[in-house]
Amino acid sequence: MSLKTFTIAPDPANPKLTERVRGLDQDGREIETAVTVERPLTLYLNGQEIVTMMTIGDYPDCLAVGYLLNQNMLRRDDRITGIDVDEETDTVVVRTERATDYEAKLKKKTLTSGCAQGTAFGDVMETFESVSLPADVRLRTSWIYALSKQINLQPSLYLEAGAIHGCVLCQQDRPLVYMEDVGRHNAVDKVAGYMHLNGVSAGDKIFYTTGRLTSEMVIKTVQMGIPILVSRSGFTAWGVQLARQANLTLVGRAKGKRFIALAGTDRLVFDADAAGADEEDRRHGRKGSRDDD
C-alpha cells in the first residue's frame, strides 16, 4: 500500500479527545486549559475478554488489532472476520476465523514500564528471537533531521494539551502515519494495527517515537519487522541490549543536530551538515505543549 505524507495525523480539534478545564495559575489568576481525555476500552477476542486499556479513544480498531498482534494473540495469517466497536459500552470485539482460547496465557503476564497499564506475555520473547530484520536498509542523517522537523511542527494533541505520547511510521524523510495516546504502548499498537489492516510493508520503514527507548518499545518495533527506531528521548540498558541482539538500528536523543546511535550503526549514512540542521532546529523548533510533560 502506498501512503502519502501524514496519511493519518493527530486531530487536536476533535472535541472527543480533549476537555476544557478551569483552574488557577501560579499567580492565582483564573485560566482555562485543554486536558487530554482518558477512557477505558475493553478488548474481546472471539468473545473472550482480553484486557481493559486506558486510551484517548480514537482508532479503537487499530489499537485492538495492534495489541493482539504484539501480544502474539493474533497471527499474521489470521483472517479477521469482523471488528465491532461499541462506544456506549467502551468495548471492541475482534473476531477471527480461527478459534482462540488464551485463558492460560492471560494468567501469565508481566507489567511493563509503559504508562496506562502496559503488559507483556512470556512467549513474546520467544518470537522476538526468531525475527530477522533486513540488513541492507540505510538511515541517512538528513532523514533524521527532516523527520524531527516535520513531526515537531505537525499540530498534535501533545501541543494542544500535553500528557500524551506519539508514534510515527515513516519512510525515508516522510512521516506517514502519526498516532498519539496516553500510553506509548497504545500509540505503537495503533500503528501496528493500521499497518496490518491496510497491508503496509515494514522492511523499508522507520519508526519514530516521542517516548523512551525501553525494552517494550524495542520488542514491539522488532515484532513489527521495522529495522530502524528513532526517538527524541533516551534509552534503557535492556532496550539497547535487545536492539543489538536483533540488529535494530536504535537512535535516541534526536534533537536538532544531535543524536546518539547505540545499536545497528552500520545502517547510518552521514550525509547532512549537522550545523545547518541545528540552525533549522532553532528557526523551526518545537516549542512544547501548552502544558508540557
Model-based region annotation:
Residues 70-72, 80-82, 91, 120-123, ...:
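Short, surface-exposed, polar/charged, turn-prone segments marking secondary-structure boundaries
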Residues 87-91, 138, 212, 252-258, ...:
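A general structural signal for short secondary-structure boundary/capping elements
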Residues 2-171, 176-178:
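Intrinsically disordered, low-complexity regions enriched in acidic/Ser/Thr/Pro/Gln residues
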Residues 98-109, 179-186, 223-233, 276-279:
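Short, Lys/Arg-enriched charge-dense amphipathic segments
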Residues 185-273:
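Feature captures the catalytic cores and cofactor-binding loops of soluble hydro-lyases/lyases
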Residues 280-293:
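Long, low-complexity, intrinsically disordered segments
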